[in-house]
Regions:
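Active-site hotspot residues in diverse enzymes, especially metal/ion-binding acidic/histidine motifs
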Residues: 1-213
Length: 213
């Protein structure tokens, strides 16, 4: 279960970088795009991946959840069509659940025997409703795991003005959702996307333009 621990953004980035370093040491080759998140989850952390029907409340979309004691990431097979039509979504959700495993799961409880007659409930459901701090932290971990600085920075170092075609190019290279790329670049202070979807160099530039209208 979640320990409700506070994580600084730089701590989350460091934890993601450490996990990538462990994987690099294990396989003995340099990291390259896209980050092999399935192999990392299965071979390094020993998480298994399962597809089955997951219950959803009205007006709710549940994509996946984590069963820590069973070391399972369970994807909702009812949302298979959504995964198929959304580039990068499967990898994004899987890395998000890896983030929960690394940040929030008490590893001391993983190998404990379950209570007889009681099935383990899924935790940390990736759902469409309001996001908790645990969810936000897992998502930030995912963004640094799948879009690490050493692989991102050389691609954007000489870019002066970002546009959507370039962002979609990055999406395809890193194989994440387009929102991951957008938020990743926004957090680096390289752009700001307004409610209409227009890209600005910064939020300050957008606010200045808005005041002039």
């Amino acid at each position: 279960m979640s320990n409700s621990q506070f994580f600084r953004p730089e701590t989350i980035e460091r934890r993601a970088s450490e996990l990538l370093a462990k994987y690099k040491t294990k396989v003995g080759v340099a990291l390259a795009l896209p980050i092999p998140i399935e192999r990392l989850a299965e071979d390094l952390i020993d998480l298994q991946i399962l597809w089955q029907t997951l219950p959803e409340s009205e007006n709710e979309t549940v994509l996946a959840g984590l069963a820590p004691r069973k070391k399972l990431v369970v994807f909702n097979e009812n949302r298979l069509m959504l995964f198929d039509k959304t580039p990068g979504l499967y990898r994004t959700v899987l890395a998000h659940e890896v983030g929960h495993w690394e940040l929030h799961v008490d590893k001391a409880t993983v190998n404990q025997l379950p209570i007889p007659g009681m099935d383990e409930q899924l935790q940390y459901l990736f759902r469409s409703e309001k996001q908790s701090w645990d969810e936000r932290n897992a998502h930030l971990f995912m963004s640094h795991l799948l879009v690490p600085e050493p692989l991102l920075n050389p691609l954007i170092r000489n870019v002066q003005d970002f546009d959507w075609p370039f962002l979609y190019k990055l999406r395809d290279m890193f194989q994440v959702t387009i929102s991951v790329i957008r938020i990743r670049l926004e957090r680096k202070g390289l752009l700001y996307v307004d409610q209409r979807g227009d890209i600005h160099r910064s939020r300050a530039e957008y606010n200045g333009q808005a005041r002039m209208v």
